[in-house]
């Protein structure tokens, strides 16, 4: 199945010069959505994953069904002020400044093998901050999986030597 057939490209959104890759058509098609989830599940199968971690919001959309299929838990990564209990945080650089991500301080147990799942790998700031928090909690990042990678933005460099899987390249 060619998953790119289920990605809408929106020119000049959210600002001039950006081509936004919209995964909504993929999610709206049960066969395409299921296929994408199964591809990530297949990638995770041999990695002995204990927990899926997904950044808000589209990491939830992709990560939760993967966790369900694997029969394991899911831990959300959120912006500050969105999680109700004690959190840890990591800052990451954006095009015009610094942003912060958080996760519950008890989300990952030391030694747990974690797969980070998100819809998009762009500059890599989100995944780099997520890796930092997982490792701060003693987790082992066993891999990262993305629906889409925007190759020109070189997010792969932020991942370093961590194993990763991408279903579509743009």
UniProtKB/Swiss-Prot annotation:
InterPro entries xrefs: Ade_phspho_trans, PRibTrfase_dom, PRTase-like, UPRTase/APRTase
Molecular function, one GO term: adenine phosphoribosyltransferase activity
GO cellular component: cytoplasm
Biological process, per Gene Ontology: adenine salvage; AMP salvage; purine ribonucleoside salvage
Catalytic activity of the protein: AMP + diphosphate = 5-phospho-alpha-D-ribose 1-diphosphate + adenine
Pathway, per record: Purine metabolism; AMP biosynthesis via salvage pathway; AMP from adenine: step 1/1
EC numbers, comma separated: 2.4.2.7
Coiled coil: none
HAMAP family, alphabetized: Aden_phosphoribosyltr
Family: Belongs to the purine/pyrimidine phosphoribosyltransferase family.
The protein's assembly and partners: Homodimer.
NCBIfam families named among the record's database cross-references: apt, PRK02304.1-2, PRK02304.1-3, PRK02304.1-5
Role noted for this protein: Catalyzes a salvage reaction resulting in the formation of AMP, that is energically less costly than de novo synthesis.
Protein name: Adenine phosphoribosyltransferase
Annotated gene: apt
């Amino acid at each position: 199945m060619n998953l790119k057939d289920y990605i809408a490209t929106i020119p000049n959104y959210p600002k001039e010069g950006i081509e936004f890759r919209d995964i909504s058509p993929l999610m709206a098609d049960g066969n395409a959505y299921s296929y994408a989830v199964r591809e990530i599940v297949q990638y995770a199968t041999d990695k002995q994953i204990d927990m899926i971690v997904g950044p808000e919001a589209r990491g939830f959309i992709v990560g939760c069904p993967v966790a369900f299929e694997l029969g394991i838990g899911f831990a959300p990564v959120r912006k500050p002020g969105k999680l109700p209990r004690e959190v840890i945080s990591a800052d990451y650089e954006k095009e015009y400044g610094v942003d912060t991500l958080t996760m519950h301080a008890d989300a990952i147990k030391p030694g747990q093998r974690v797969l980070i799942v998100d819809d998009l790998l762009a500059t890599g700031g989100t995944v780099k901050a997520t890796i930092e928090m997982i490792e701060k909690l003693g987790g082992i990042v066993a891999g990262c999986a993305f629906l889409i990678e925007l190759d020109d933005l070189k997010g792969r460099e932020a991942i370093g030597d961590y194993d990763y899987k991408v279903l579509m390249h743009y």
